[in-house]
Amino acid sequence: MREQLIKALLAHAQGDIQKHVANVEVYFTNPAGIGEHSNIVEAIEQELDMIAKYQDQIDIIHKYFKK
């Protein structure tokens, strides 16, 4: 059960990282096509914050719970 939970947490965090990386790529390749985000830099910073959040979760799981 423990390993299943750890795998699920890691998969969830990795999936969210990929989602936010894809969003950043969209901003880089087509910044004019995003109407609701007039401040592209701020929007990218928010995406990077989310990537950092989930990467931190992965790092903590590996450091403290993965055996």
Q: Where does each model-flagged region fall?
A:
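Extended, charge-rich alpha-helical interface modules
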Residues: 1-67
